[in-house]
């Protein structure tokens, strides 16, 4: 027996038997599962990529209307208000009338489905999330398309399971997870982050087998290839490429992580508080719900005219920040302002996510921190943009409690691979401080709220298939 074989046997002997059985006994992945995972990834990539293009089309059309026809016979501010109010109305109406589970991010719904506690009515969720998201995001509200893309990807996975009449529960679970991974990979052009998001963030629900891991990888890669074929291979965020920072500055990155850890706990609390306040206000009454949502959308139409930095998901704002167009004071004001607008939009139950708004908040505070650090420590060679990138990963890690996903996500989105060390330090610092303060992951909190929601329990649980 060779030394290598002896080492492998000794290593296996030290591992728990249930782990060995779970992984190695299912080493022979059926070809059908691999094929279905590939199909799920392709469809999730198509849905995610065209959803992004549809949102951009709505936003550009809204701007064109304001510049031409409508703006010629209505005051500009009134036209902006009415258009955005109508777009938001579409999103809120579709959600409240046809698929209440499509409200908000949608990621907690997929996690609940992976745990067997929530149904996936893909025949409702896919059209409602797609067209409702077009309306809500196109109105200028502070919402991200990434959470909806994950939910639609998961819905695609369940759709494929139903169409091909997959009965095996492990396979259905794997395809659901594969769809979620494909959705995130297509949303951010980040296949590694899509894979790791399912494995790390959804770890309480994800069933770790070689089959499920392979399904997730295949789907994420396929979805990302589809994205790149349609949109090209450029990174989602165009920004400067930085070299590795000096070792003497790493302590500042740890401090930034600690600050984001504290803020992440507060931010998660404010999100759930905002949702509770909105529910108490409209009490699930459709007229109140639609009127409130339309008014919010209209107000963001006005903000688009006068303070556009406080509107939209925030991905397009990130390059503007890192190009150095704002001072620290303005950045902190925008940071506070976007906290309020994020809570207002996400808390209202609109069909949109919180990924992109969180990344924008991390960039705002991180760049402001970098500017202040550069002023206080002129002897250090500080690039504020490095702290902006680290801030993106840190806030994601503190709120979602998935530091590895946050690190990979930011690196893939910005192509700043040299910043891996400061990203690790900042993200881990944020997670540690958030845990010390007793904070809980945001999606776990949102899933808990969903399971307590009587309206969702009554309207969403039946039926389980489109024909029942």
Swiss-Prot record:
It comes from Vibrio cholerae serotype O1 (strain ATCC 39315 / El Tor Inaba N16961). It is found in: Cell inner membrane. The gene is clcA. Homodimer. It catalyses: 2 chloride(in) + H(+)(out) = 2 chloride(out) + H(+)(in). The keyword Cell division does not apply. A motif (Selectivity filter part_1) lies at residues 104-108. This is H(+)/Cl(-) exchange transporter ClcA. Disulfide bonds: none annotated.
């Amino acid at each position: 027996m060779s030394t290598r074989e002896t080492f492998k046997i000794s290593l296996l002997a030290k591992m728990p038997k249930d782990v060995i059985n779970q992984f190695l006994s299912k080493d022979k992945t059926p070809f059908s599962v691999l094929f279905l995972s590939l199909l799920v990834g392709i469809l999730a990539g198509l849905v995610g990529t065209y959803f992004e293009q549809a949102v951009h089309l709505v936003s550009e059309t809204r701007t064109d209307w304001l510049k031409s026809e409508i703006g010629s016979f209505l005051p500009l501010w009134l036209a902006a208000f009415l258009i955005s109010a109508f777009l938001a109305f579409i999103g809120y109406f579709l959600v409240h009338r046809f698929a209440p589970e499509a409200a908000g991010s949608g990621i907690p719904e997929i996690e609940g489905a992976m745990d067997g506690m929530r149904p996936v009515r893909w025949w409702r969720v896919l059209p409602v999330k797609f067209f409702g998201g077009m309306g809500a995001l196109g109105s200028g509200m502070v919402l991200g398309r990434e959470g909806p893309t994950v939910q639609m990807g998961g819905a695609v996975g369940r759709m494929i399971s139903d169409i091909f009449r997959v009965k095996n529960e492990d396979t259905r679970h794997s395809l659901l997870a594969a769809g979620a991974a494909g959705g995130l990979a297509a949303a951010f052009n980040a296949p590694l982050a899509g894979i790791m998001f399912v494995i790390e963030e959804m770890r309480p629900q994800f069933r770790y087998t070689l089959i499920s891991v392979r399904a997730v990888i295949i789907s994420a890669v396929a979805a990302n290839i589809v994205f790149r074929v349609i949109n090209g291979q450029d990174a989602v965020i165009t920004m400067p490429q930085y070299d590795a920072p000096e070792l003497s500055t790493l302590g500042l990155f740890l401090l930034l992580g600690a600050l984001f850890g504290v803020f992440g706990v507060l931010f998660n609390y404010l999100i759930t508080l905002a949702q509770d306040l909105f529910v108490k206000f409209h009490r699930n009454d459709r007229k109140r719900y639609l009127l409130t949502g339309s008014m919010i959308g209209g107000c963001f139409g006005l903000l688009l005219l006068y303070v556009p930095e406080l509107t939209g998901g925030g991905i397009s704002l990130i390059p503007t920040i890192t190009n150095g167009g704002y001072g620290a004071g303005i950045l902190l004001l925008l940071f506070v302002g976007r906290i309020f607008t994020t809570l207002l939009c996400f808390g209202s139950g609109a069909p949109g996510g919180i990924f992109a708004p969180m990344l924008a908040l991390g960039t705002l505070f991180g760049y402001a921190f970098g500017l202040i650090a550069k002023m206080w420590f002129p002897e250090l060679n500080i690039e504020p943009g490095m702290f902006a990138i680290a801030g993106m990963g840190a806030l994601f890690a503190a709120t979602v409690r998935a530091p590895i996903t946050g690190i990979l996500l930011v690196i893939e989105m910005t192509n700043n691979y040299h910043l891996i060390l400061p990203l690790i330090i900042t993200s881990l610092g944020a997670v540690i401080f958030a845990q010390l303060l007793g904070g809980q992951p945001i999606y776990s909190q949102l899933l808990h709220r969903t399971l307590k929601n009587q309206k969702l329990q009554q309207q969403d649980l039946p039926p389980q298939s489109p024909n029942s």
